[in-house]
Amino acid sequence: MAVGKEILTKIRSVQNTQKITKAMQMVSTSKMRKTQERMRLARPYAEKVRMVMSHLAQTNTDHGIPLLESHREIRRVGFILITSDKGLCGGLNANVLKKFLAQVQEYRNQGIEEEIVCLGSKGLMACQSIGLNVVASAVNLGDTPKMEMLLGPLTELFQRYEKHEIDRIHLVYSGFVNTMRQEPRMEVLLPIGENVIGDSAPKSPFSWEYRYEPTALAVLEYLVRRYLESVVYQALSDNMASEQAARMVAMKAATDNAGNAIKELRLVYNKSRQAAITTELSEIVAGAAAV
């Protein structure tokens, strides 16, 4: 019964793996719900800032703020690449990286260089492994990242845009559609215009005239920064919800596959045990007949 013992050992091993994947599935389900709740709570603030920025964009006023400049010749682009810090989430990171690398290659074909800020260790490791120009990063963000953790890398990129060292900034992340579907997204974060504000922003038939205190420049610079930060944080929240959903689905599939493997191994074990019993009975009968 050496074969039977080996099969039993395999069954126990798969059962232990199944317990782990089941636990990870339950943890991911809980984390996904919490992340969705954070997305819901942050949405009113983001929508209000977005609405004001939409009104400002519709005024077509030159406020003298580099972050509000709408037209530039593209010579160098920046990317904010958002990925997860951990794996075991299916093809989530691979799909985002595929979209990101395709855009990088398209720019390189036009002679346009890139500078990258990575939020998440998976994207950082991927960029470093192929020699891309990573200028800043933030990793190990945890389950409840604070905006303060992102300000350093983001400020680095925004300042380079203000100095005209970068002419466009893309935001790349996994968008949460539903539990079963997450899609890679790429948006133009800067310059601020229709690509970020227009289609989904509230439209109004009226013109807006704002009065600024203490000065228009001070208010607008502050508002634009808060707007950009809210867009990035919303994308990060989307990516985290996508990560937990993808991990939950992946772990459920792994748990189900482990269950199927256990059934097949038990069937093989029972067949081998039955064959061994049949052989022993045959030997007993043959021995009795010989006597």
Curated annotation (Swiss-Prot):
Family: Belongs to the ATPase gamma chain family.
Complex and partners: F-type ATPases have 2 components, CF(1) - the catalytic core - and CF(0) - the membrane proton channel. CF(1) has five subunits: alpha(3), beta(3), gamma(1), delta(1), epsilon(1). CF(0) has three main subunits: a, b and c.
Role of this protein: Produces ATP from ADP in the presence of a proton gradient across the membrane. The gamma chain is believed to be important in regulating ATPase activity and the flow of protons through the CF(0) complex.
Pfam families, alphabetized: ATP-synt
PROSITE patterns: ATPASE_GAMMA (PS00153)
Chief location bin: membrane
Bilayer disposition of the protein: Peripheral membrane protein
Alphabetical UniProt keywords: ATP synthesis, Cell inner membrane, Cell membrane, CF(1), Hydrogen ion transport, Ion transport, Membrane, Transport
Listed HAMAP family: ATP_synth_gamma_bact
Gene: atpG
Record's subcellular location: Cell inner membrane
PANTHER family associated with the record: ATP SYNTHASE GAMMA CHAIN, ATP SYNTHASE SUBUNIT GAMMA, MITOCHONDRIAL
Protein name: ATP synthase gamma chain
GO cellular component terms, A-Z: plasma membrane; proton-transporting ATP synthase complex
Classification lineage: Bacteria, Pseudomonadati, Pseudomonadota, Betaproteobacteria, Neisseriales
Example of a GO biological process term: proton motive force-driven plasma membrane ATP synthesis
